[in-house]
Amino acid sequence: EQSVIWNSWLRLEPNYNQEIVISDSNQRHKDIEAFENDINTAFSEIRRILKDNKHFSLTFHSLSGLEWKAVSNACVFNNFNVVDYEWLEQKTYPPRQLNRVKSIKGDVLVTFRKNPEPVRLRVCDDEQFTTIVSDFITETIENGITDTNGIMMAIMEWIFRNMIIVGNVDVFMILNKQFQLSEDGHWNIK
């Protein structure tokens, strides 16, 4: 992991309890719920120290819709508005990303602005959210964006920009269950 390199270079002792990660280790107790709580705590602290209308940027990569949910909800709850949303493509991909057509390749770079106004949330129940995401994916495919990267980046940008709170729904699962992936790596409407 990069944190090992940075800690070594900076001659720091890592404090694994303070890391915002998901770990399979039984000793670390870093599951998706802890990740969501830690991310929200971090974003609350960013909101506390950041001046009104000032910016911060976040890079993120995950294959888990629940991790994306944790990040997007923390941004929305803390009233950060998207200023810029970019896809950072890598020049070369690790084998894990190359060999999976359902994989997201690269990172997203999102720049947010601290909105000093009261937050205006768009809250849907899980069934409503699943329906509007399914409709959004259908529209995205009909507009010619059919690869996993394009679809997932469009969904996440839409969630961020519309300040939608995501419930217990994994957007990757909506894509996988309600749409069909062709052999050449393009999603189709079932």
Which functions belong to the PLM regions below?
Residues 1-190:
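S-adenosyl-L-methionine-dependent nucleic acid methyltransferase catalytic domains
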